[in-house]
Amino acid sequence: MTRILLTTTALACAATTAFAGGVERSAGSVAILFEEGNWAEFSLGYVDPDISGVQAVPAGPSSPAGAQSGDIAPAYTQLSGGVKWVISEDVEAAIIVDQPIGASVDYATDTGYLYGGGSAAFGGSVAEVRSLGITGLLKYNLPNNVSVYGGLKAVKTSGEVSLFNGYAMSTSTETDFGYLVGAAWEKPEIAARVALTYASEITHDFASTENGSPTAFSTTIPQSLTLEGQTGVAADTLVFGSVRWVDWSEFDITPPGFAFATGGSSLVDYDNDTITYTLGVGRRFSEEWSGAVLASYEAAQGGFSGNLGPTDGSTSLGVAVTRAIDNYEITLGARYVWIGDAETETPSALPYPPGTTLGDFDDNSGLAVGLKVGYQF
């Protein structure tokens, strides 16, 4: 099984994090470590979610039940790249650059929906989280087709939010460190590989400004465990898949001023961890062309979702195709996502008992497309 087919499946798998749980935008794949020889790659993705909801209860004269939120999830681009070197027969190294977490939420101001400013004079609600990650890895090849690998990851993160009720918060830009460790077994003659990777949590201690007042809080990017596998099942045909667990129940954004004003609520938090399953088939059509199809599933957790992230689980289908030209490989991929239905809860300031539904976000979807260019040198 040649590199062209493996590159096709790699881009197909990478696209699955575009709508993953929490605020994850990149799974931090270490697949580059298993490329043949010296290798460089660059990926560009465009993600266009379509997430909208309907208000279930009135929140004032200008914010009635039935108000439509409009699409609250702006499209965004995603960049990543990496370089891998063969240092010796037993040692290989790689540097990976990605955007591991991110979020973009924008409730329009002219909809009547509460978070769009339907019952207040402060306008809509906007939130943004940005990050940049750099990972350095070493892989040591042991006898019997076994390898171990590990390294350090630095993540730089910042964010800001402004809500319909006049609350505004921005953070400092913080850079902190975590680590990755893993092990793999390979059988190259049938393109078989199983790899297990653990990524540690990374905690940021932010300085923040809430409505002009200096505050501080901590947020933890959660730990994760990823099992990836692939094997040839027939001439020029590869089956691949993964199972990824992320400890999202440990993630929260809880600035102290917001918590005090709302009786201890968080801006963003998650009650449950997520497990994402991916399964696909790759096929080499010729020495120059290969393709792949894949499906991905993340179960809904139930309960309420946050008003700044009203989704719950997802199901997706994706395709990718690769063209090899000399030492270059160019891959195009696309994925359509059925985003899980979600309900959000009324804020504590409204005269409703806890557990009252504010918004129903149903029948939402998204489209992700990507381009990857790889070069063997």
Model-predicted segments: where are they?
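N-terminal, post-signal peptide beta-strand-biased segments of exported outer-membrane/organellar beta-barrel
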Residues: T2-A108
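Outer-membrane beta-barrel porins/channels
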Residues: G21-V23, S52-Q55, A59-P61, Q78-S80, ...
